[in-house]
């Protein structure tokens, strides 16, 4: 399977940079020259500064309108660069990594997603977005809600990562994001690395594309890992990966259309009876009743690793909370704005104009009404 990871904005390029570390094909797009220079693993010729004529290379200060305009202005440059990387080989999936709460990522990613769908109709466009932390305040929440709406119209799937679920207590925002980015890449890279790999029962690119072609709905990744020597019930470990504690989004899995499960570990632990017991349970839970699976026995492994992907999700508390908060704020803000305008009008209504208070030059027949020249002389 061929995938191209495209990082957009500060958050997105940091995530893409970690994908580059584990040998994925990547490209970075940002409005901040400094953020692009900070990257460690994406080659310099694949780092593109966009919107320089608007921002001077200093970023958009979390303003999605500027992020959108920056992407629009330099979209021909971006698409040419992507075309030079893609060449004549098909790309199965474009993964766009970004932060829902930022400016360049939130504003620019929907623009790029739409352009990629038009240019490469046989490829999937999947957005991988980090939802903002509660501590970041209202502005990132509003950015996220609007971006969710826009991406749902152009992307095949939106893999939303709820940072609030992954953040460990006591972490500040900076260190929390660093850990979260590593977690996102580790889990998704683990899944992609197993596609088209020989196994007892394998997943291929068409399986993954089928699961992710989900009409702009949400998808989430689940994960569970344990020391093989301590696994007493493999079925329970698999189920843990798609229950709330294992998922990266607070979602109702019963609303999912499709599922995909990849299991990797020593052969003596990967018992077929345990695996099918767990998969039968998952099949009974999700609405679409379609589960793709891959089993990868490896005698060199000491751990059992389970990666789950659920797609076609329309019920998520994480998403619903963001959208509801943004709507409530919008109503409150518009009401406050209307009240402020009304009070301003009430306060200032009835004031005279200057012409009502001071006689005009024409009315006095003088070039110096009211003796202003004399006043200026005295003031000296």
UniProtKB/Swiss-Prot annotation:
A GO MF label: GTP binding
Domain of life: Archaea
Subcellular localization, as worded in the UniProt entry: Cytoplasm
Region listing for Disordered, in residue ranges: 359-380
SMART domains: Tubulin
A Pfam match: CetZ_C
PROSITE patterns: TUBULIN
Gene Ontology CC entries for this record: cell division site; cytoplasm; microtubule
Keywords: Cell shape, Cytoplasm, GTP-binding, Nucleotide-binding
Role of this protein: Involved in cell shape control.
Family under the similarity heading: Belongs to the CetZ family.
PANTHER family: CELL DIVISION PROTEIN FTSZ-RELATED, TUBULIN-LIKE PROTEIN CETZ
Protein name: Tubulin-like protein CetZ
Species for this entry: Thermococcus kodakarensis (strain ATCC BAA-918 / JCM 12380 / KOD1)
């Amino acid at each position: 399977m061929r995938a191209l990871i495209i990082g957009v904005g500060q958050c997105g390029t940091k995530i893409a940079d970690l994908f580059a570390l584990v040998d994925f094909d990547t490209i970075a797009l940002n409005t901040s020259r400094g953020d692009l220079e900070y990257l460690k693993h994406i080659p310099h010729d694949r780092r593109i500064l966009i919107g320089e004529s608007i921002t001077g290379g200093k970023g958009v200060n979390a303003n999605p309108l500027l992020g959108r305009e920056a992407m629009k202005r330099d979209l021909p440059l971006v698409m040419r660069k992507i075309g030079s990387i893609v060449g004549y080989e098909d790309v199965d999936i474009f993964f766009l990594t970004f932060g829902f709460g930022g400016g360049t990522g939130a504003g620019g990613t929907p623009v790029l997603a739409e352009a990629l769908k038009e240019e490469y109709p046989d490829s999937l466009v999947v957005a991988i977005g980090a939802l903002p932390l509660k501590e970041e305040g209202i502005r990132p929440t509003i950015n996220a809600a609007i971006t969710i709406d826009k991406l749902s119209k152009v992307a095949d799937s939106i893999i939303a990562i709820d940072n609030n679920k992954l953040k460990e207590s006591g972490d500040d925002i900076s260190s929390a994001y660093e850990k979260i980015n590593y977690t996102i890449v580790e889990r998704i890279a683990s899944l992609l690395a197993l596609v088209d790999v020989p196994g007892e029962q394998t997943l291929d690119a068409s399986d993954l594309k089928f699961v992710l072609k989900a009409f702009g709905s949400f998808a989430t990744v689940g994960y569970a890992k344990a020391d093989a020597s301590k696994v007493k019930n493999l079925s329970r470990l698999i189920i843990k990966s798609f229950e709330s504690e294992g998922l990266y989004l607070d979602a109702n899995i019963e609303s999912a259309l499709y599922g995909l499960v990849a299991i990797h570990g020593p052969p003596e632990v990967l018992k077929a009876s345990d695996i099918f017991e767990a998969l039968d349970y998952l099949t009974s839970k999700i609405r679409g009743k379609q589960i793709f699976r891959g089993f990868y026995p490896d005698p060199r492994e000491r751990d059992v690793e389970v990666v789950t992907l659920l797609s076609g999700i329309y019920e998520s508390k994480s998403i619903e909370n963001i959208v509801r908060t943004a709507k409530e704020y919008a109503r409150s803000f518009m009401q406050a704005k209307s009240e402020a305008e009304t009070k301003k009008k009430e306060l200032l209504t009835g004031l005279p104009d200057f012409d009502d208070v001071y006689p005009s030059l024409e009315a006095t027949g003088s070039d110096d009404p009211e003796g202003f020249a004399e006043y200026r002389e005295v003031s000296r």
